Amino acid sequence: MSYFEHIPAIRYEGPQSDNPLAYHHYDPDKRVLGKTLAEHLRIAVCYWHTFVWPGHDIFGQAAFRRPWQQPGDALERARMKADAAFEFFTKLGTPFYTFHDTDVAPEGDSLREYAANFARMVDYLGERQQASGVRLLWGTANLFSHPRFAAGAATNPNPDVFAWAATQVCHALDATHRLGGENYVLWGGREGYETLLNTDLKRERDQFARFLSMVVEHKHRIGFKGALLIEPKPQEPTKHQYDYDVATVHGFLVQYGLQNEIRVNIEANHATLAGHSFHHEIANAFALGVFGSVDANRGDPQNGWDTDQFPNSVEELTLAFYEILRHGGFTTGGMNFDAKVRRQSIDPEDLFYGHVGAIDVLALALERAAVLVENDRLDALRRQRYAQWDDAFGRKILAGGYTLESLAADALARGVDPQHASGAQERLENIVNQAIYGLR
């Protein structure tokens, strides 16, 4: 059975085409900085927003009528969903996908039933991967939707909930390994608090760290070579989450000795919810040595929640890609579309329109970022700004050649009189705009 029979395979037709079901800027075979666009972008489609979400919101019921979401045998519907998903991936021409365990398999009425259902669907996903050539970018476990996780998973006051969550992660990590996944993501949607009045912060942080340590141990025990990634988010659904932003996650990892084992998966909309730019979070992840992968989406600046819209800003993404390219690009990570069509977008074509447009935006942004990397104008000005630290005096300070007292004595003896230099922000912004809009 075909679920998108009337929709052709999406091909590159160039910027002059007016076909809404074609790529206008994404030519997967085009080479930029020595790699193809497909190799740079490593695009993934997410299971949950694309095939699981029924179009409900907090004010209204499900608006979609997907064939695989209709009542019936749960495992049969899961197989239908997988068939639809892989037909979609294949027609879109995207190389990767991502999932939560309960996206792909019915949870059932017990932990044993969950494990059995998931095992059957992992077998089926393996068959679909082999037939299509589509690969798994990352897997994860849903530890936030069921009411048992209302007070958290790893941070729950009930150790039985901790054990249930550990079971899900054990199975999800095993499945990710078996399916050739390149990363495993841990998102602590309920790992936080609603009120401090009933919360023991130290205990919950210790529990969370113990849980992560167990995941790390299991990764090495089964021989999984992919990266473990935490996805930062400041709040929603909880009032405050312990993985607030990149810097918070890094500090947590260092505190518990996990900084060499876990990196971050950065979502654009989560960055803005934390009061940061997407550019900031990516740059900070590289500065702290924890960059892993990206969830590509956007929020609505007039809304204070996670709207998970498709990315449409070449300007925003150019700066994100600039950081990624200047640091060597993705290794195990990629660009996962953690994005969903709007509730009123009920037609099957809308799923394609959202992804096609966003993929074109990624391609445009990456090519503009490549211009910034190739012309080296931003980096040259940055190097010039810090050049004095590369002189003998600056190197001596950083190498521990002075104490605080001896440095003060030296400064007094030399009568240092620092002169302020321009930060040249306006010039730098002009350089970025020239690259984005093809002015130079």
Swiss-Prot record:
Residues binding Mg(2+) 1, per UniProt: 231, 267, 295, 338
Alphabetical UniProt keywords: Carbohydrate metabolism, Cytoplasm, Isomerase, Magnesium, Metal-binding, Xylose metabolism
Protein EC: 5.3.1.5
Record GO biological process: D-xylose metabolic process
Cofactor comment text: Binds 2 magnesium ions per subunit.
Domain of life: Bacteria
Keyword Nucleus: no
Catalytic activities: alpha-D-xylose = alpha-D-xylulofuranose
Gene Ontology annotations for the cellular component aspect, listed alphabetically: cytoplasm
Active site, UniProt feature: 100, 103
Subcellular location(s) of the protein: Cytoplasm
Family: Belongs to the xylose isomerase family.
The protein's name in its UniProt record: Xylose isomerase
Gene name of this polypeptide: xylA
